[in-house]
Amino acid sequence: MVHGFLSSNAQWIENIDALSEFCRPVTAELFGHGGSPSPDDVEYYHPNHYVSEFEKIRQDLNTTSWFVCGYSLGAALTARYSCLHFDRVTGHIMTNSNSAFASESQSKEWKKTAKKSGDNIQTGGLSAIEKIPVHPRHAKKLPSKIYAALEQDSVLLNPIGIANTLRATTPNASIRALAIENHSPALLCWGTQEKRFLESKIWAETNMPNLEITEIEAGHAVNMQKPQEFNQTVQSFLKKCATL
């Protein structure tokens, strides 16, 4: 289970116990986030390197196949892994992810501004990170328990790690070229209240094979705003995949 940009494993606190009743949740934090390191080498942050890291985790767990789950930017990374290692993936769960389904023009725009955005964060430090709209302190609609946990973890955000994420992860996150040949059963837990994701949802629905979509009346933070619905949806999906 991989969280989103400027988030941490704390975003799953209302999901872990419920999911543990029918599977073994394993969480991973992005470079520069939570307890993960912040390598200076920007290549560590490329989505393809994350795929390699996920495969190492699978091997360390000594499992031949598994379910993977990603949220937002994390979903772009787990979806990439799922497409490239479909023989190891029993099923893939993802939430709204504009980075995963970014168009070619959007990816080009991100690449054009990547260096400047990264440099601004590396120079400005935590105060610059706090100004980013998706910083946890701005997520006032989250349940108070999750909001407090994410805000507490936000002091662990590393300027070098966040800068390199903007330089290498986000600009290269789109899986459109891979998604059109998706082999693994995939579930999109669609937070219907996030209007800016609608175009991406339509693209995925039209172009990604083996994808099912479940509507959940929530915004971007679907697993945090509606944890019970998210947990039940994931459980149903896992049971369905187990019979395939």
Model-flagged regions — what are they?
Residues 13-17, 23-69, 73, 232-235:
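Active-site loop/oxyanion-hole signature of alpha/beta-hydrolase fold enzymes
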Residues 79, 83-84, 90-122:
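Flexible "cap/lid" loop of the alpha/beta hydrolase fold
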Residues 218-231:
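Catalytic histidine-centered segment of alpha/beta-hydrolase-like enzymes
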Residues 103-109, 122-180:
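Conserved alpha/beta-hydrolase catalytic His-Asp/Glu region
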Residues 6, 30-34, 99, 219-222:
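Alpha/beta-hydrolase active-site loop signature
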Residues 4-7, 72:
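Active-site glycine-rich loops that stabilize anionic/oxyanionic intermediates
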Residues 183-218:
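Conserved loop-alpha-helix segment in the C-terminal half of the alpha/beta-hydrolase fold
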